[in-house]
UniProtKB/Swiss-Prot annotation:
Reaction equation(s) it catalyzes: L-arginine + H(+) = agmatine + CO2
EC number(s) stated in the UniProt entry for this protein: 4.1.1.19
Cofactor(s) this protein cannot do without: Mg(2+); pyridoxal 5'-phosphate
Pathway assigned in UniProt: Amine and polyamine biosynthesis; agmatine biosynthesis; agmatine from L-arginine: step 1/1
Domain of life: Bacteria
Protein name according to UniProt: Biosynthetic arginine decarboxylase
Keywords: Decarboxylase, Lyase, Magnesium, Metal-binding, Polyamine biosynthesis, Pyridoxal phosphate, Spermidine biosynthesis
Function noted in UniProt: Catalyzes the biosynthesis of agmatine from arginine.
Organism name: Geobacter sulfurreducens (strain ATCC 51573 / DSM 12127 / PCA)
Length: 635
């Protein structure tokens, strides 16, 4: 076996650069998770998954590491505290978690609990999210910011929550919304705590750039701000405006775009203060990105700045503009949901098989006796025997031409099925031989840099891409994917990952690699009777809630894990994934009705002796077991 180290594995998956010091590889070759970047403690992912399977918790399994979530909250607050101290900033910083990032009860509950020491708030954008926010704020004093479109019911709920004593701010997104708020305030006699969202000309970058700029969906234009101030003053509500909000998009990849937005947004704040609006908070929205591919670049799956640089720029730019304008520095709020939640969640699942088969015919004899072979096949044999590093380019080009020729000859009836199969087999042998030579050549000839795609095998994984990582399909988002074991061995397969849905789009063909995006994932050959697991990392933001029910594959099993010094880990919560009957219920089918319909039909067939009682009973038992079982694949 070729010598290989865990450091080499870490390098080819670029783990040190995207892992934020939260993931490593141990001496066994297994991926480990750390509770914080500075912690020496870790959990062996493969050992954890093996233990969960013994507990009858089957893959795919969504692992939520709650200490990592707590650590991310602490990190964001720590870097802002440091930036405030270094810049002698005279006001405060506060984090608000946007519930839309992941609305799962246990997740919001953990964030509310961990964030209490930092006075963390919740941002809501709909009536259901408002109810969630109120439920967590009850008895806890958690502040709430209300964004999004609002109807009468939404606004009235906020007004009465204000009256009862909740710390809740309703953000004006549109002028018609302000008019409705004023009317309902008069009707109820309740004065709300108000925020105003402004539409900046500054825009973000990447997939969410349209969240900012003149054509942004939300926010008031400059002329509308002037009109809003006048309207609020007329209705004795100007003193209720406490917050200014702007947002130029999620996953902002370039720090200069953030600086531009901060400068413009703070200038608007300063001018509004001069007009007599007593704003105390500036909410800079989200946008703090995650380096999914570890490239530290402005590519949309990365960011060209650190969290420390982000915090320093926020504090410096706001202070600088306020001092220049001669106005009081505001308290700062950010809604960094992606940066808070992305790292804490890992999906682990088993690989089922590949698109290659051990039952493939072996044409080794063709390498010896070539007299009876078709000329095209004979030429392929000759190339295979003679190829070396000096003839690589020519032999590669000839091989491509000959395999195309073989297909054409077969279609015209001049090659038999057996001869075409021989040509395919030889094509694969030649490419693998070329690859063995190319791996030792530096630099790789330009014409050969993409030929490895011809060797890429498809590994089928027990999951639904559309359910578990929908952004991979919808917007071509990169997520790190790494085998969680055997990383002390050199990977010997170049693979793509296909899910188990009946959809050709359910395949991942772009991966995080050593030098950025790559078209294949290095994996190991699967061994008979041995499970092989891969982990999908940095999926804690948006993926769970955006997932859909394609082919009726439902929610996966989810396990909440915390670190324990004595036992290594502690399982806090197990949330079982959807059974088949639950998935069917989403689309208005009822398991008992299905069983009754089938049973009634089978009873008629038994009476007519089309089936036996035993066959009928066995089929109903299988159907019942399927309804009660996991939607994903078992043995």
């Amino acid at each position: 076996m070729e010598r290989w180290s865990i450091n080499e594995s870490a390098k080819i998956y670029n783990l040190p650069n995207w892992g934020a010091d939260l993931f490593s590889i141990n001496k066994k070759g297994n991926v480990c998770v750390h509770p914080s970047p500075t912690s020496k403690h870790s959990i062996d992912l493969r050992a954890l998954v093996d233990d969960l399977i013994k507990r009858k918790i089957k893959p795919p399994i969504l692992l939520r590491f709650m200490d990592v979530l707590q650590g991310r909250i602490a990190s964001i607050n720590r870097v802002f505290k440091n930036a405030i101290d270094e810049n002698d900033y005279p006001a405060t910083y506060q984090t608000f978690y946007p519930i839309k990032v992941n609305q799962q009860r246990q997740v919001v509950e953990a964030i509310a609990k961990f964030g209490k020491r930092y006075n963390i708030g919740l941002e809501v954008g709909s009536k259901p999210e408002l109810v969630i926010g109120i439920s967590f704020a009850t008895g806890n004093g958690i502040p709430i910011i209300c964004n999004g479109y609002k109807d009468t019911e939404y606004i009235e709920t906020v007004l009465y929550a204000t009256k009862i004593g909740y710390d809740i701010t309703i953000v004006v997104e549109k002028m018609f919304e302000l008019e409705k708020i004023i009317a309902l305030s008069k009707k109820t006699g309740i004065k709300p705590k108000l925020g105003i969202r402004v539409k900046l000309s500054s825009k973000g970058t990447g997939k969410w750039a349209t969240s900012g700029g003149e054509d942004a969906k939300f926010g008031l234009r400059m002329s509308e701000i002037i009109a809003a101030i006048g309207l609020l003053e007329q209705n004795d509500l100007l003193d209720r405006v406490k917050l200014l909000h702007f947002h130029i998009g999620s996953q902002i990849t370039k720090i200069d775009k953030i600086k531009s937005a901060l400068i413009e947004g703070t200038r608007i704040y300063a001018e509004m203060r001069k007009l007599g609006v007593g704003i105390r908070y500036v909410d800079i929205g989200g946008g703090l990105g995650v380096d999914y591919d570890g490239s530290k670049s402005s590519y949309f799956s990365s960011v060209n700045y650190s969290i420390e640089e982000y915090a320093n720029d926020v504090i410096y730019q706001i202070k600088n503009i306020c001092e220049d304008a001669g106005v009081e520095c505001p308290n700062i709020i950010s809604e960094s949901g992606r940066a808070t939640a992305a790292h804490y969640s890992v999906l682990v699942t088993n690989l089922l098989n590949t698109n290659t088969s051990n039952a493939m015919p072996d044409f080794e004899e063709t390498l010896n006796g070539t007299e009876k072979l078709a000329p095209t096949v004979k030429k392929l044999v000759d190339i295979y025997k003679s190829i070396d590093r000096y003839s690589l380019r020519e032999d590669y080009h000839d091989t491509v031409q000959l395999i195309q020729e073989a297909v054409s000859l077969f279609n015209l009836g001049y090659l038999t099925l057996n001869e075409r199969a021989m040509a395919e087999w030889l094509h694969g042998k030649i490419l693998r031989k070329i690859n063995g030579i190319v791996e030792k050549i530096k630099p790789i000839p330009e014409e050969l840099q993409n030929f490895q795609l011809s060797l890429r095998q498809t590994y089928f994984a027990n999951f639904s891409l559309f359910q578990s990582i929908p952004d991979s399909w919808a917007i071509d988002q990169l997520f790190p994917i790494v085998p969680i074991q055997r990383l002390n061995q050199k990977p010997d397969v170049m693979a793509s990952i296909a899910d188990i849905t009946c959809d050709s789009d359910g395949e991942i063909t772009s991966f995080v690699g050593e030098n950025g995006r790559t078209k294949y994932l290095p994996l190991h050959k699967m061994r008979k009777d041995e499970d092989y697991f891969v982990g999908f990392f940095l999926i804690g933001a948006y993926q769970e809630i955006l997932g859909d029910m394609h082919n009726l594959f439902g929610d996966t099993n989810a396990v909440h894990v915390t670190f324990n010094k004595k036992t290594g880990y502690k399982i806090d919560t197990v949330i079982h994934g959807d059974a088949t009957w639950e998935s069917l219920k989403y689309v208005q089918y009822k398991g008992p009705e299905i069983l009754k319909h089938v049973r009634d039909t089978l009873e008629k067939d038994v009476a007519l002796r089309k089936v036996t009682i035993e066959e009928s009973s066995h089929f109903l038992e299988l159907l019942d077991r399927t309804l009660l079982g996991y939607t994903y694949l078992g043995e």
